A protein has these predicted regions:
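Short hydrophobic/aromatic beta-strand immediately N-terminal to the Walker A/P-loop
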Residues: 2-4
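The conserved Walker
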Residues: 8-9
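Conserved lysine of the Walker
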Residues: 13
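Conserved substrate/cofactor phosphate-moiety recognition/catalytic segment
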Residues: 17-60, 64
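Short, structured coil segments at secondary-structure junctions
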Residues: 24, 85-87, 112
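Glycine-rich phosphate-binding loop used to anchor ATP phosphates in small-molecule kinases
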Residues: 45-100
Length: 117
């Protein structure tokens, strides 16, 4: 099962993932750590697409091996969420604006989610 924890920067995604991961015994991928491993800090639409597909690839590997996996990342658009293709979505709707204006402008509130915090 792929769980996406999404929301604006500073909304608490990583905080929640850190606490949920041991409770579920899940694999966990944090977007900043994955970007660091890939040395890819491109936040253009193309860069965000690559990141979503990168996160999907890591999560799918865990899912195929019957592990629950948590991915925490902004996943700002309907398209990036569709590409990632989560089984469950937790939307952290805890702040009105994040610290990056470009992300605030790009962010689309999800129409589909399982939990909204």
């Amino acid at each position: 099962m792929k769980i996406l924890i999404m929301g604006l920067p500073g909304s608490g995604k990583t905080y929640l993932a850190q606490r949920l991961q041991p409770l579920l015994g899940a694999a966990w991928f944090n977007a900043d750590k994955v970007r660091e491993m890939a040395n890819d800090w491109d936040f253009s639409p193309e860069g965000r697409t690559r990141q979503s597909l990168r996160m999907k690839s890591l999560a799918d590997f865990e899912s195929v091996n019957k592990r629950v996996v948590i991915c925490d990342f902004i996943c700002p658009t309907a398209e990036t969420r569709k590409l990632f293709d989560p089984d469950k979505v937790i939307w952290l709707d805890t702040i009105e604006k994040g610290r990056f204006e470009d992300t605030n402008a790009l962010f689309e509130k999800p129409e589909k989610f399982n939990f909204r915090i």
